[in-house]
């Protein structure tokens, strides 16, 4: 996340990089992040899987007009940034990126989307709360059982139906919408760097990419 914040701070100096950090994040990481320009740290309690929804509520901040959501274990790179620029230059309500065959399993990848506040009819916090509360209704036919994919299930159930007709979609595989609904990628994949590629560290601390494009 530290490297991501440095890259984004340099590329989008007028944007705010809002990082949601639970209480178990090491103090030295918090210190380094807090010193990076444009970074705003939001400390949240440890809530397990439910923490994955915290970042979606950035759109509710009074001074946020457009939100882009990214995972901490993926790098922003030229291909991803070009997609962001396409959305910023459009008038679409929601931005969706799918850049791997596994991404076709979900209408919206939880760490690869964006949203304009002007398209919202109610706060994101209210939408999230309503969806989570379904799991507390005994025998509700849409009962929610939280797991590590719950954020993507939420986006499929509660967000995609609202905005799919107003979406700018970059999709390399193209299984979920007709080709005419898709926007082509302007930057080719280089060095395995597709949008959403996961970075890991080996035992010596060297960084490597996890998946083939």
Predicted regions, residues:
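N-terminal anchoring/stem segment of glycosyltransferases
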Residues: 1-46
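Membrane-embedded transmembrane-helix bundle of lipid-linked glycan/lipid transferases
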Residues: 2-3, 59, 86
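A short, glycine-/small-residue-rich helix N-cap motif at loop->alpha-helix starts
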Residues: 47-54
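Conserved hydrophobic/aromatic beta-strand scaffold that supports enzyme active sites
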Residues: 58, 94-96, 112-114, 154
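Short acidic donor-binding/metal-coordinating loop in glycosyltransferase active sites
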Residues: 64, 72-74
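Short aromatic/hydrophobic "clamp" motif used to bind/position activated sugar donors
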Residues: 67
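Conserved donor-nucleotide/metal-binding helix-loop-beta segment in metal-dependent transferases, i.e.
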Residues: 76-108
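Catalytic core and acceptor-binding pocket of nucleotide-sugar-dependent glycosyltransferases
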Residues: 101-103, 115-213
